């Protein structure tokens, strides 16, 4: 649903927070279920994504995922690397705090000036524009360690519905409201 709506609205980047670095504290059965769900999705839908000209990009500490899943991720990224209509960024084993720490460590290791540009260039999202819009579902009003650096000027909408219940009408309603916002990035 969301993918098709993004395509209809000419949205070029969609980032989904699928598994946080903190989610490892969940029951093992749930973690296995979530990883299996992703594996099934990638295996079943990769050809459809290619057909629709959709690029997959994964961000997070991917090297800490099960090796079977890592291979599937690399394969999916490789198969879709030249697709241009929509880029879906899947945040997997992602935590913004560790992303920032790793970025700063990389800047120090490279012995370059620590500034906004160098930190931004060393984030997992260095090749992705900062989000214009964040929709947080589930009636939770927090960022949950998601894209803390990148969300500085993002318009944030909190939706009471849970993700599985979030539908095309909800998406269009939020997008319609978002389009009416005059974005000034800190200026008047």
Residue ranges and their predicted role:
Residues 1-188:
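Flexible, compositionally biased loop and terminal segments
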């Amino acid at each position: 649903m969301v993918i098709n709506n993004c395509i209809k609205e000419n949205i070029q980047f969609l980032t989904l927070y699928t598994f946080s670095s903190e989610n490892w504290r969940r029951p093992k059965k749930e973690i296995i279920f979530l990883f299996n769900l992703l594996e099934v999705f990638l295996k079943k839908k990769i050809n459809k994504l290619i057909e629709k000209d959709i690029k997959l990009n994964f961000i997070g500490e991917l090297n800490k995922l099960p090796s079977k899943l890592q291979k599937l991720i690399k394969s999916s990224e490789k198969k879709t690397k030249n697709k241009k209509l929509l880029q879906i960024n899947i945040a997997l084993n992602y935590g913004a705090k560790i992303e920032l720490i790793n970025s700063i460590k990389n800047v120090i290791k490279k012995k370059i000036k620590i500034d906004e540009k160098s930190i931004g260039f060393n984030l997992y999202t260095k090749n992705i524009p900062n989000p214009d819009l964040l929709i947080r579902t589930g009636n939770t009003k927090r960022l949950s360690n998601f894209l803390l650096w990148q969300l500085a000027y993002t318009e944030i909408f909190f939706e009471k519905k849970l993700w599985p219940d979030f539908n095309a009408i909800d998406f269009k309603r939020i997008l319609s409201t978002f389009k009416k916002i005059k974005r000034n990035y800190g200026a008047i």
